[in-house]
Amino acid sequence: LPVSGVTAKTARVVIPAAIARESYDVYVVRGAQEQYVATVKIYLTTDQEVPDKEGMNIKGIVFCGDKGVPGVRVSDGLQTVTTDENGYYWIPSLKTLGYVFITIPQGYLPAALDNNMMMGFWAGLTDEAGVCEKHNFELVEADTENHVMLVGADLHLADKQNDLRNFKNGFIAETQAFADASSVPVFCLMAGDMTWDRYWYDRNFRLPHYRQWLSRNGYSVPVFHAMGNHDNDPYVQGDAPGQLSYCRTLGPNYYSFNLGKVHYVVLDDIDWINTGGSDGVLGSRDYNRVVSLAQMTWLAEDLAAVEDKTAPLVVCLHVQLYENYNASFANTAKMPSA
């Protein structure tokens, strides 16, 4: 597809009207050279017009079938709003974090909940703050009252020493078989370090390659993600630049969702420093362990909106909140309290 326009952050192409709802590998082609950019999925959505509102630069509709879904929380990570009776939402956003997402409401799942890892509950922002952009979210009714959440972490995939083969024949094969045999919906939460920043560039295996690999290997268990320290860009300094690739590839670095009566919260407790990092130069990959004030502010509003205060709450972070330096490894009769 020819490029119809570019900005400092984006490139635009015209999508053919007859394009199918499917995954596509995107390459930039110049003469005889080509560079893989990402794997994207084309979704078909409603063409319902959402009216503009003064001062609002993100808008859209959350819908199920031919009806809007009211009361759904929508956020850019800093500002959070709730859909109105028509399922419409508007956000006055600084577009600082580069994404918008919904909190999946109880009794629904995103229609685009698939193995391409987009998950259907978030969208990347594409325009400058002065431009209003529209992002719709389609839901389907789903019974997740009983479900299974599998948890994985610290994959450190780098396409070296047969790690991809071992991951495929181990975790992927076993959890896929478990999900196929399950009588209730099965989900997975990867709690960080899906990749290994040290080898992002040496081995050419970064977060887009991880997502592409997972999709191409037919893993059908829907995967939510949390960000780990090794999922930051080792060539850049600072938390916001360091997490940019993650947020563009796997979505918001903090968010929440509901499955059945369980309220899940995913937070990012990595404050990326990466002393000495620059273009082509690996930094020291150092970081602070902290949950930012912006996240805590968002979290307070998120938890306040949970109607049933007795509902189970699951909070996921990559770095442990508590450490016991006096701990020892030994077989015990039961697991001690964390």
Placement of each model-derived feature along the sequence:
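His/acidic metal-ligating clusters that form di-metal
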Residues: 176-187, 218, 263-265, 277-338
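Active-site environment of divalent metal-dependent phosphoester hydrolases
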Residues: 157-160, 196-199, 227-236, 272-275, ...
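Active-site neighborhood of phospho(di)ester-bond hydrolases with catalytic His/Asp-centered motifs
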Residues: 151-153, 187-193, 221-229, 314-318, ...
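Short, acidic Ser/Thr/Gly-rich low-complexity loop/linker segments typical of extracellular
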Residues: 3-7, 70, 75-93
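Extended active-site neighborhood of metal-dependent phosphoesterases/phosphodiesterases
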Residues: 105-127, 131, 200-304
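Immunoglobulin-like IPT/TIG beta-sandwich domains and homologous Ig-like subdomains
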Residues: 1-36, 77-79
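Short, ordered, surface-exposed loop/turn motifs in non-cytosolic proteins
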Residues: 55-59, 63-78, 96
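N-terminal active-site segment of His-dependent metallophosphoesterases
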Residues: 49-57, 64-65, 109-201
